[in-house]
Amino acid sequence: MGAPGRVLLWLQLCALTRAAYKLWVPNTYFDAADNWSQNQTPCAGAAVKFPADKMVSVLVREGHSISDMEELQDRKRENIHSFIHCSFIDRASPPASPFRCPAARTGALLPVQSLQCTCILAHRPLLPLDGEFVLASGAGFSAQNTGSHLDCSAGASALFLDPDRFLWHDPRLWSAGDAGRSLFSVDAERVPCRHDDAVFPSDASFRVGLGPGTVRVRSVRALGQTFTRDEDLAAFLASRAGRLRFHGSGALSVDPEACADPSGCVCGNAEVQPWICAALLQPLGGRCPQAACQDALRPEGQCCDLCGAIVSLTHGPAFDLERYRARLLHAFLALPQYQGLRMAMSKVPRQPHLHEASGAKADTEIQVVLAETGPETGSAGRLARALLADIAEHGEALGVLSATARESGPPVGGSSAAGLNAPGARSDLMGGLVAALLLLLLVLLVAALLLRRAGRLRWSRRHEAASEPAGTPLGFRNPVFYTADSVDPPPAPQPDVRSSSRSYFINPLYGEAEAEAEA
């Protein structure tokens, strides 16, 4: 059975035992274009450079024609016409002593046997500080003069990128076994969790940087070996093969205990989530991109906000996580109206609410994240409400005790018009406009009444003004200041000597009556 078959068998066994696994994706292949500068493999006749202060194992699958191999920090070129030690790694027929390769001539392949072999430089490393070529069957190098190929200019060199750039805590470098079109994992769970199996491709070259702290997983599979005990794993990491593939200040340990709870187990990456988010956001300058919706949500274990909905479930002993996930996939996400959604489901620590006493409820819950991937919004909220209705009807049979839902707001920017096309959005808009108009009319009416009462606002009666004669003067006759030409002013009254007042006036309205009485 070949290496791909063994990996497939291992993954099937993991699935049968309900154990999740994460598969390491990047490699350090010589033939992989993304391991070289300018995203292309060395062309024929090119000079090849490796970082001088790094350790790496490089798998070579094909034949290559190159001119020189150089160290970055040593400008003296090491010509490919050098002696190489080639030690066979096939234990079935190991050689008595390291095989001595003769100097290669121009145009001639370095000796490559039918067995896979690891080539190490005899005196000065062509590779950096400590490294190796792993030559597959039929692979090798041939020497060719610089510039003999049209694609290679004189003095052009191909740079092998830093192999230490691959970090364990980078979620982009792992592939989950249960990943699908409608499924995803929150960022903290994209890295191997406490009860996961970390699987590295067999018979392949790779390089993994262990970050700070201790990484603990259920098992580690590398180079065709499965490590479930710390003693065996520590011996491998201390070996030359282990040092070439694992580096860093962190520690790696295993615990073969599997997750036996049908409702799932907490991932256990909460402590290393800051490093996970730092590695994930490093290409973006350490900042999250702006979400495409208002009131975006950030699920437990996610580094950045997203648009969609979150359904939180509390469960009883009858709840089965895998069975409920399958139910949602087939009964809901398979429907046409939910095709643009992706779902993540896992057990997470439960954050108690402010009005709850500590320890009043379970300390874990099931988090169902419904993420919207398309420009249209609202489908995640509709699915969340459908799940609540389904739980209200079948919750007891499913083992769900209670459920709550949260959903993000409408889109931001130019995409907000899409949300206004929904019937509910249009009715809300019309209701808001009517309420605003009524409020405006009420404010105007109150302002007019206040101004009228204060005397700052008057209006004339046009029908009364029209009925008055043309010659009638406007206003009223003030007897104090008004004097008519045809009426003589009344005589001034004589002051009463008995009065102690020194100044007084007579009211013109009553002055005539008093004068007649005195007469």
Curated annotation (Swiss-Prot):
Residues 1-19 form the signal peptide. Residues 20-430 are extracellular. GO terms for biological process: protein localization; protein transport; receptor-mediated endocytosis. GO terms for cellular component: apical plasma membrane; clathrin-coated pit; endocytic vesicle; endosome membrane. Residues 67-143 are annotated as: Interaction with CUBN. Its main location: membrane. The chain crosses the membrane at residues 431-451. It comes from the Eukaryota. Disulfide bonds join C43-C152, C193-C267, C259-C265, C277-C303, C288-C304, C293-C307. Residues 256-308 form the VWFC domain. It is a single-pass type I membrane protein. Residues 452-519 are cytoplasmic. Glycans are attached at N35, N39. It is found in: Apical cell membrane; Cell membrane; Endosome membrane; Membrane, Coated pit. InterPro entries: AMN. Detected in kidney cortex (at protein level). Keywords: Cell membrane, Coated pit, Disulfide bond, Endosome, Glycoprotein, Membrane, Protein transport, Signal, Transmembrane, Transmembrane helix, Transport. N-glycosylated. A soluble form arises by proteolytic removal of the membrane anchor. It holds the Pfam family Amnionless. The complex formed by AMN and CUBN is composed of a 400 Angstrom long stem and a globular crown region. The stem region is probably formed by AMN and the CUBN N-terminal region, including the EGF-like domains. The crown is probably formed by the CUBN CUB domains. Interacts (via extracellular region) with CUBN/cubilin, giving rise to a huge complex containing one AMN chain and three CUBN chains. Membrane-bound component of the endocytic receptor formed by AMN and CUBN. Required for normal CUBN glycosylation and trafficking to the cell surface. The complex formed by AMN and CUBN is required for efficient absorption of vitamin B12. Required for normal CUBN-mediated protein transport in the kidney. This is Protein amnionless. The gene is AMN.
